[in-house]
């Protein structure tokens, strides 16, 4: 008969951000344990609050399945001596299987008789299996941070205070340090009391009786409904931030949402400051009207019931008011100084002690951004906006507001720049230069912001590499991988030409030419920045499950241009299942293998038709001449591939009728020039020799 097993790990309050991943880990470990133990089950349900991680196994088999198997031992000639007596090898083998020599049978394996015995292992009961393994399920969990308590050396996310371990209505014994498993759980810290769980199936209902909503999904739905009800009552608009909702949900066991207010005078502060104060610092949901204007109200969630809710709201209002008062002070005070004053202060702000100051970084970024602006074809207006943004883009780091709210760097730069009369495009670029702030974060929307973001990240990576501070393994203290991945994403979004190695060399030359290296010695660079960026391109492809051989093909192309890598990968990925794809690639790679051995100057590939020896040469020559007229930078990668693929039958005929490596040197060189011309066009796709076609 199917059973239900319950395991609840009771803890001191966990940080909100670890609750969900931890209970999912517990579920995964429980599933693996049960499967490894051959104990069948139907489902594993999770429950979690800040004080508990729980799994409930449904439809659990009452015992393991019995196991019958046939085990092969030594060959007969080893198992018996010349007189037919059992040898030590046979006796030892049978004992090892829990059998005797009487159980041995012989079976032929490829013409040789071997010893075999049949073994039978009776399945253990579910209680026996659980008793033997649940301790490991609990103790072998991993957490981002761990702690010890009392005099124990054992580490866990938080001290374990109780354990409930029930198989239906029977306690399954588990002992962790001084905590023995039982059937008693704990209710809400303030509203509830200890509660005895009658059976594993009663867990959720029993906890509800002591003011604990154990199901995280139901608790979250309750919070969402309560917020919506408050908004509807007051004609408010509340955009529920899902990350905040998840955090709040993992801070409470019995949620009650309530509304609060703050003085309208604080609405003169930028919205971003108000939202940051409420959402990020106080975990409040902010309120707007139908036109998306902030209103002087908020919604919060308490871990408790509605008793004395007015006092709770007033307490939260006081805390928020204190923070907004600080913000108002800094907002007013910061505007008493010019942008140039803040820029001058950056001369005393260290970017890194081995690299220099933030001011010096800005000077390098100004040169890099000017160089990239020309390369990317920005208009004169955009170039001027970019140059001005690069001159001042870090100034807000030394403002009081960013000192109090570091997460608003860039945002306040935008706000203050516009207040001081700067072009809004300059302010937008200052805001956007941090983007993207994560692997899938928002990208800059403006070209000016995109170039500044690339320039800033290129400088950071180049500077750290120049002083030998490169990421290794999982160690990346300066987030250089994230910044490099950001460059890759921005380049793909903008579609800019970005030959990695050429740009690395050109940018370093620009900095040296403008005497803006500030003692950075690029000659001492321990690893090429280009290789580092190329690895991030690989990461982008791998994240999207692009075939590894397609990735190698485009990565190992001669130009190593990020834009061309993306275009080529898109085309090869789109055509890999075409009926003629295999034949086309094989024709190309045969041609490429031959031309790879050619020792001819790539700048003199003039073909002499008078040296042709068959019609196939002429037909291919005519087709290539026509293709060369179309094969310009304006031609899309898709059209290039299709046009080259159309040459396949002509290339096949060419090889069937032509002895490429003719004994006549002039004829041979003419053949190679003709093929090299095609190879140069094929190589735009990358190194097709890396492709695996079946």
From Swiss-Prot:
Record has Cell division as a keyword: no
Pfam families documented for this protein: DALR_1, tRNA_synt_2f
Top-level taxon: Bacteria
Location (main, coarse): cytoplasm
Coiled coil start-end: none
Compartments reported by the entry: Cytoplasm
Matches recorded under SUPFAM superfamilies: HD-domain/PDEase-like
Catalysis performed (reactions): tRNA(Gly) + glycine + ATP = glycyl-tRNA(Gly) + AMP + diphosphate
Keyword Aminoacyl-tRNA synthetase: yes
EC number: 6.1.1.14
Assigned GO CC terms: cytosol
InterPro entries per record: DALR_anticod-bd, Gly-tRNA-synth_bsu, Gly-tRNA-synth_heterodimer
Gene Ontology biological process terms in this record: arginyl-tRNA aminoacylation; glycyl-tRNA aminoacylation
Protein keywords: Aminoacyl-tRNA synthetase, ATP-binding, Cytoplasm, Ligase, Nucleotide-binding, Protein biosynthesis
One MF term in the entry's GO annotations: ATP binding
Top EC class, one word: ligase
Subunit and interaction comment: Tetramer of two alpha and two beta subunits.
Stored PANTHER family: GLYCINE--TRNA LIGASE, CHLOROPLASTIC_MITOCHONDRIAL 2, GLYCYL-TRNA SYNTHETASE
Family: Belongs to the class-II aminoacyl-tRNA synthetase family.
NCBIfam families xref list: glyS
Name of protein: Glycine--tRNA ligase beta subunit
Protein's organism: Lactiplantibacillus plantarum (strain ATCC BAA-793 / NCIMB 8826 / WCFS1)
Upper taxonomic lineage: Bacteria, Bacillati, Bacillota, Bacilli, Lactobacillales
Encoding gene, per UniProt annotation: glyS
């Amino acid at each position: 008969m199917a059973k239900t097993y319950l395991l609840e790990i009771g803890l001191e309050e966990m940080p909100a951000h670890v609750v969900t991943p931890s209970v999912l880990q517990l579920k995964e470990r429980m599933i693996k344990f049960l499967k490894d133990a051959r104990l069948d089950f139907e489902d594993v349900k999770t429950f979690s609050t800040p004080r508990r991680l729980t799994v409930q196994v449904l439809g659990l088999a009452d015992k393991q399945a019995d196991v019958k198997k046939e085990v092969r031992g030594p060959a007969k000639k080893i198992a018996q001596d010349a007189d037919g007596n059992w040898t030590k090898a046979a006796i030892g083998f049978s004992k090892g299987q829990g059998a005797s020599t009487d159980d041995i049978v012989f079976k032929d394996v490829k013409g040789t008789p071997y010893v075999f015995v049949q073994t039978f292992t009776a399945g253990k009961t579910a209680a026996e299996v659980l008793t033997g393994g649940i301790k490991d399920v609990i103790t072998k969990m991993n957490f981002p941070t761990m702690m010890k308590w009392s005099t124990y050396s054992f580490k866990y996310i938080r001290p374990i205070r109780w354990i409930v371990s029930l198989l239906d209505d029977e306690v399954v014994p588990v002992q962790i340090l001084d905590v023995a498993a039982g059937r008693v759980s704990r209710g809400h810290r303030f509203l509830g009391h200890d509660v005895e769980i009658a059976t594993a199936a009663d867990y959720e209902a029993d906890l509800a009786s002591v003011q604990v909503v154990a199901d995280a999904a139901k608790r979250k739905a309750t919070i969402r409904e309560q917020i919506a009800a408050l908004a509807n009552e007051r004609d408010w608009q509340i955009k529920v931030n899902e990350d905040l909702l998840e955090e709040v949900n993992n801070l409470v066991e019995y949620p009650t949402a309530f509304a609060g207010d703050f003085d309208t005078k604080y609405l003169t502060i930028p919205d971003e400051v108000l939202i940051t104060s409420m959402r990020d610092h106080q975990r409040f949901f902010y309120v707007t009207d139908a036109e998306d204007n902030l209103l002087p109200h908020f919604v919060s969630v308490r871990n408790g019931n509605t008793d004395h809710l007015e006092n709770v709201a007033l307490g939260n209002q006081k805390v928020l008011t204190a923070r907004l008062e600080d913000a108002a002070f800094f907002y007013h005070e910061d505007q008493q100084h010019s942008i140039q004053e803040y820029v001058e202060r950056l001369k005393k702000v260290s970017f890194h002690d081995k690299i220099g100051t933030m001011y010096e970084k800005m000077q390098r970024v100004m040169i890099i951004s000017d160089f990239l602006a020309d390369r990317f074809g920005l208009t004169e207006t955009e170039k001027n906006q970019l140059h001005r943004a690069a001159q001042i883009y870090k100034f807000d780091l030394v403002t009081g507001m960013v000192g109090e709210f570091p997460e608003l760097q860039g945002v306040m730069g935008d706000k203050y720049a516009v207040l001081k009369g700067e072009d809004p495009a300059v302010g937008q670029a200052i805001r956007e230069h941090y983007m993207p702030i994560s692997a899938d974060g928002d990208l800059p929307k403006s070209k000016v912001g995109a170039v500044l973001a690339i320039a800033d990240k290129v400088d950071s990576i180049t500077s750290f590499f120049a002083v030998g501070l490169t990421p290794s393994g999982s160690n990346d203290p300066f987030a250089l991988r994230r910044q490099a991945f950001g460059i890759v994403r921005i380049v793909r979004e903008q579609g800019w030409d970005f030959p990695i190695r050429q740009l690395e060399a050109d940018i370093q030359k620009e900095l040296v030419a403008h005497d803006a290296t500030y003692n950075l010695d690029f000659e001492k660079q321990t690893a090429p920045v280009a290789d580092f960026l190329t690895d991030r391109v690989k990461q982008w492809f791998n994240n999207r499950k692009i075939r590894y051989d397609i990735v190698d093909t485009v990565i190992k192309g001669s130009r190593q241009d990020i834009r061309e890598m993306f275009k080529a990968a898109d085309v090869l990925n789109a055509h890999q299942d075409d009926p003629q794809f295999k034949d086309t690639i094989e024709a190309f790679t045969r041609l490429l293998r031959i031309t790879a051995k050619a020792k001819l100057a790539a700048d003199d590939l003039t073909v002499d038709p008078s040296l042709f020896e068959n019609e196939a040469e002429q037909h291919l020559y005519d087709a290539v001449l026509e293709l060369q007229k179309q094969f310009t930078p304006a031609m899309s990668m898709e059209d290039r591939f299709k046009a080259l693929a159309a040459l396949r039958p002509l290339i096949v005929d060419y090889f069937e009728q032509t002895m490429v490596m003719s004994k006549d040197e002039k004829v041979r060189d003419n053949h190679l020039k003709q093929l090299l011309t095609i190879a140069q066009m094929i190589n735009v796709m990358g190194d097709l020799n890396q492709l695996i076609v079946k």
